[in-house]
């Protein structure tokens, strides 16, 4: 049993046959965070903790957008409201998360809300050789399967939309050598390879694959300059295009 309650984490219950009593195994939230999120920043932990508190008052069965920074920076709630969408929408994106970290915190970032509709965009931070070398692709896709398995195991017939990875741009005039090194694997070829496999995985689970990239891509298959912040992340004008592609599913 895992249940986050404020600053205390209930990690298990043992039954003592001699005393015929149950014993709760309790650890501090901060201690458990260090064990399962050792590479995470203090800011990421703080965001997740805040989401945990918000989940306690959130309404169940609503629409959820979840993932990493590309989801966190999506002003979906404001855009939806401005466009006359009255459905309650929650955003549980956390910048910098990879799929391993998402799996560790999947209860807070997804399951605890018991959403009826899920839009998920996670994994761009796995497109790197820093963690698992040239096995990054297989590792990413294996984790995506695990995420979907958990969703369908724990939730009652949710409507799931696996969102395609957005295009990146490695040729912006204001990029530094450091930023290009950080995102060097996010080429049009690798993004397309990932999206093709994501589509197969989504279809194998019977969920929806949603590609919102048609208005984001330039003639070279890269992110259009007018939307680009750093070549990965986008300004709100880019997200307005994304919203136009997915609004029919809200």
Regions found by a protein language model. Name each.
Residues 170-212, 237:
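Substrate-gating cap/lid alpha-helix
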Residues 102, 226-250:
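Histidine-centered active-site loop/cap adjacent to the catalytic His
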Residues 83-88, 174-184, 221-229:
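Short glycine/proline- and charge-enriched loop/turn segments
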Residues 121, 163-164:
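Alpha/beta-hydrolase-fold catalytic nucleophile elbow
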Residues 10-13:
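Flexible glycine-rich surface loops and low-complexity tracts that mediate binding to linear polymers
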Residues 36-145:
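Conserved SGNH/GDSL esterase-like catalytic core that processes O-acyl groups on lipids
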Residues 155-159:
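A short helix->loop->beta-strand "cap" motif at the edges of active sites that frequently abuts
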Residues 127-130, 169-175, 217-223:
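Short acidic/His/Gly/Ser-rich catalytic and metal-binding motifs that mark active-site loops
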